[in-house]
Amino acid sequence: MALDRYAALHVSTPQGRGDGRPTADQVLRDQDPLGSHWSDKVILITGGTAGLGAESARVLHKTGAKIFIMGRDIAKGEKVAADISASNPDYPPIEVIQMDQSRLESVREGAVEFLKRSGGKLNVLMANAGIVASPVKETQDGFEAVFAINYLSTFLLVQLLAPALVASTTPEYNSRLVVVSSAGHRASNIDPDKYNLVGEGYDPSKAYARSKTASILMANEFERRYGDRGVHALSLNPGIIMDTEISRGLPGTSASRREQYYKMEPLLAQYEKDVMQGAATQVWATVAKELEGKGGLYLDDVQVAREATHEGQFCRPGWKPWIWNEDNAVRLWKDSLNMVGLESEN
């Protein structure tokens, strides 16, 4: 299957939510990893209690894989899990694990609980959880919240679960780390001398952008370290989706935010996706046969992305060259180990 099989569906001018661009369900039907092919697999989705994470769980549950979702609100997660599981009663029920990504100790506890319940098996880690730009605040661990939640907590979880990914890989299906990032990375590179953007002059948009750049750099460095061990990392931009809870830190309702942003950037009305379309790229990253054995790629619009040729216009696809800076990736990895209290990879 071609890596650009969905490109034609994105070439013509998009018509907004619910247009002809593919949904996660369509991607799954096209790949058809149903029944016994996936019944032996374990998938863990962070931020799986709402939005793109919940939609990914809903679609991937149809494969017959064992699905775990992580989230802060255990009650909300249990309802999502019950609703999805009831729609596919012949498949293993979805399980919920509580994890608050604003607290590193909660990440450690969540990892321990997952490994206990899964028996140490993990074929796909989908790092989906995150928050949007928000007023400055620090976590109890002393890190700026957007950086901690969007990047550092995920880095720690990846370190704790990497051995399970390695142990679970097979020649037929290499284990995958799927990192949900954002086109917002194009607004700023990281500053290796100042990861923690706190204090006077704090810019929430820059903090968000840097956290997303950091996530991509992490995925690329993971690929360099684990690719030859049969585990591959892919990062991606799901697109502009305003109906998810990632925007909970912004004022107003989704409708009022949509109206406000449409005025600021008219292209949003064309490029915005609904949740079903927004989850398509991360589901593709999980099930695509054409991505087997591949990693270190940045995906966008259900295809391998190209360099952005336009300034601004973050609703449009593409990446900035700084996501491929290996020196920054190596330094970020080493610095992150220190920040989360690990001397070396487990």
Swiss-Prot record:
Induction: Expression is induced in complex medium (Czapek yeast autolysate medium) supporting calbistrin production. NADP(+) binds at residues 52, 76, 100, 128, 208, 212, 241. The active site is at 181 (proton donor), 208 (proton acceptor), 212 (lowers pka of active site tyr). Its EC number is 1.-.-.-. Residues 18-32 have a biased composition (Basic and acidic residues). Keywords: NADP, Oxidoreductase. Calbistrin A has been reported to possess a number of interesting bioactivities including antifungal active against Candida albicans and cytotoxic toward both healthy and leukemic human cells. GO terms for molecular function: oxidoreductase activity. Pathway: Secondary metabolite biosynthesis. Residues 11-33 are annotated as: Disordered. Oxidoreductase; part of the gene cluster that mediates the biosynthesis of calbistrin A and related compounds. Calbistrin A is a secondary metabolite with an interesting structure that was recently found to have bioactivity against leukemia cells. It consists of two polyketides linked by an ester bond: a bicyclic decalin containing polyketide and a linear 12 carbon dioic acid structure. The polyketide synthase calA is probably responsible for forming the decalin moiety. Belongs to the short-chain dehydrogenases/reductases (SDR) family. This is Oxidoreductase calI. It comes from Penicillium decumbens.
